[in-house]
Amino acid sequence: MPARLDARATRRYFDNAFNSPAVKILPNEYYVTNGEDVMLSTVLGSCVAACIHDPVIGVGGMNHFMLPEGDIHSPASATMRYGAFAMEVLINELLKAGAVRERLEAKVFGGGAVLSAMQLMNIGERNGQFVLNYLKTEGIPVRAQDLGDVHARRINYFPRDGRVMVRKMAPHHQKAEALIAQREAAAAQTVQAETRAAPRVERFDTPSRRDPVGA
């Protein structure tokens, strides 16, 4: 499945705290390095980020997805919003960059229930369970994970050597809360819209009242 070019993160900056060039990964984006020494950074609420790299050649990448899976019959499911698509894109782009599938290692983060609405829909929990199941199916070992809880997280990932630094953000961090609330509301609206749009399937548990054929 080809990657969406508009989903590749483009927001570059220099992080003074880490003295490193960096790329900011927003929701529904991904980034794969070509061996350059760069830090990938994102902020997570109920969303999940998978950090995957090939330790032999130092190529790695990160994605940031909001929901586990969409309706496979809907074109909307083929977007970086959904984990199933975001994971496939990330792995395919790593292989294109020279990574070897058998050497890939993963670290996964996020899936927090940072807002009450997210707790009711279990979006964070579902995202976390999805990414673990996906990686298990693909045979990619998970070397570290920090999933669940009620905190937002800032992730700083160094793909060249696989290091990840996680900072759990205070529950009342106003700037973070405002940003995450906006993203979480969008995710919740998507879930609700998909639930309303789900086709109804009629069940035929009782014998039909039609006249027998040939009557």
Swiss-Prot record:
One of its GO terms (biological process) is chemotaxis. The lineage of its organism: Bacteria, Pseudomonadati, Pseudomonadota, Betaproteobacteria, Burkholderiales. This is Probable chemoreceptor glutamine deamidase CheD. CDD domains: CheD. Keywords: Chemotaxis, Hydrolase. Probably deamidates glutamine residues to glutamate on methyl-accepting chemotaxis receptors (MCPs), playing an important role in chemotaxis. Its EC number is 3.5.1.44. It comes from Bordetella pertussis (strain Tohama I / ATCC BAA-589 / NCTC 13251). GO terms for molecular function: protein-glutamine glutaminase activity. It comes from the Bacteria.
